[in-house]
């Protein structure tokens, strides 16, 4: 599975999890004991035990690699990627750039909700740095560590991905994990100094999201083994954490916003479930209790759309109750097309139409997030 932090977070999605997975995807953070271990079953990563020769070994293409693949898919880190031997392209693939936009958007929503963002050079620059922390650094960290611990699943579902295929060595993967993590935390600390915070809230959001990402993917907790807890953690990483980071950067993170974004994270749970359907075979084989495995595809697809739709309708009702009539109507207007697309694609066949459904429905969802952010800023 792939995995969403204030940035990071969550997402993790296109690999064995899905496109929304682990997400400012402030997501996982490996402890200092993270090491590289060559055994097929790795509770931890043990760089110290890795053969030094692996760092210089050239990437290889498996004998059974697909005859053709898309270079574009490879760069985005999604299924159907072309086999690549360029180590930097492989590194980029592991970070799954396709999962960065939700985190970047979350930062934008948080900045809008603060009511204090201005189109000045300084504010725009600060927001870009926050987006870099949430997307390339912390989401990239989350996706890489998720792929590391998912290699057994990927060996079943997508055996030609970089790690199970041997296209990148163990030491190279571990190095990437630490560079992205430390880079993201460093940017978080820089943003706190830049914003003049007495308490380094952005740094701690990044640290917390990184830890969440780690326990999402790694044993012994491995939250993703539970469909409810894992997918909610993913939703929070992709929606809540980046929003909080953006709002804290330009304003004050208030309790009502925390509650509202946690509610929205339930919709993120539903979106994360979409990605579980394509991994049902590998999840069942390895004992992961994703919702499609636990409840069956028919029930799980209704849980999925229910989480997405009921959450947005609840937020619209909340906005209406606070006198934000036009914002509530706008959110309702953005929810209706999602329901139509669910019946048109997802509910018919969640495996066949998962990509088409997400590509067509998610734009309405993310604009609904922005509508909510603008409503709370007034």
UniProtKB/Swiss-Prot annotation:
Note the SS bond partners. none
Which Pfam families does the record match to this protein?
Answer: UbiA
Q: Which residues cross the membrane?
A: 173-193, 199-219, 232-252, 257-277, 302-322, 327-347, 357-377
Q: How is the cofactor bound?
A: Magnesium or zinc; or manganese at a lesser extent, but not calcium.
Result when mutating residue 304 to A: Loss of inhibition by N-phenylmaleimide, but no loss of activity
Q: What is the recorded membrane topology of this protein? A: Multi-pass membrane protein
Regulation of activity is described as: Inhibited by N-phenylmaleimide (NPM) and diacetyl.
- Which GO cellular component term is one of those annotated? chloroplast membrane
Subcellular location, record wording: Plastid, Chloroplast membrane
Reported impact of residue 150 to A:
Total loss of activity
Keywords associated with the record:
Chlorophyll biosynthesis, Chloroplast, Membrane, Plastid, Transferase, Transit peptide, Transmembrane, Transmembrane helix
Impact when changing residue 161 to K: Reduces activity by 66%
Annotated catalysed reactions? phytyl diphosphate + chlorophyllide a + H(+) = chlorophyll a + diphosphate
Which metal ions or organic cofactors does this protein require, according to UniProt? Mg(2+); Zn(2+); Mn(2+)
In which family does this protein belong, per the annotation? Belongs to the UbiA prenyltransferase family. Chlorophyll synthase subfamily.
Tell what the record comments on domains: The N-terminal part (1-87) is not required for enzymatic activity. Amino acid residues 138-160 are probably part of the polyprenyl diphosphate-binding domain.
**Protein name in UniProt:** Chlorophyll synthase, chloroplastic
Q: Which organism is it from?
A: Avena sativa (Oat)
